[in-house]
Amino acid sequence: MNPSEKRLFLIQSLLDERPTCHRQPIPADSERQKILLRGLMNVRRPADIGTEFLQVQDAYLQSETAAKGITDITGLVPVKPGLYIWQGDITTLKCDAIVNAANSGLTGCYIPNYRCIDNAIHTYAGVELRLACEELMEKQGYPEPTGQAKMTPAFNLPCRYVLHLSLIHI
């Protein structure tokens, strides 16, 4: 599958999961398709999904991230040993871990296409991230206290881990 076919497969699969949306027309324009895909990923509840979807999603997201350009921490200059300050697209940072400004449920922002760090990280990591967060929270049995964090694999992000830090919402 080429990138366009992968994107269409992902969109159709996510639409098929939502009975009220399965007849949603898919835009012909690739940029509008990307917006629709991101929105569908943003509203998807944590749940298992088939292996074929994950394989296509992983290839697609990794390709999209590579096209944005990956920033490797080894090319940055630390301000102190082991401490780096960097500004840019956090979903392109290749390092040990990035920090997600999360809500107390840790499963992400469910507002479609909302431009927040939580949505960006959950979108480019893939649907596995939300499920991993849900599993951690179910095991814990209560919302994450403000100022506390949980760590998950980064899935399709170039970093190794995501630290989900529960913050106060003002």
Protein language model features and the residues they cover:
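Conserved small/polar residues in nucleotide/adenosyl-binding loops
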Residues: 168-170
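Short, functional N-terminal and low-complexity linear motifs
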Residues: 21-27, 87-89, 152
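Non-catalytic accessory regions outside enzyme or core folds
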Residues: 1-76
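Short, charged low-complexity intrinsically disordered segments located at boundaries
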Residues: 68-69, 85, 128-129, 148-152
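Short, conserved "active-site rim" segments that organize catalytic pockets and cofactor/ligand binding
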Residues: 87-141, 146
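Long amphipathic N-terminal alpha/beta scaffold segment
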Residues: 59-101
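Active-site alpha/beta core segments
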Residues: 135-165
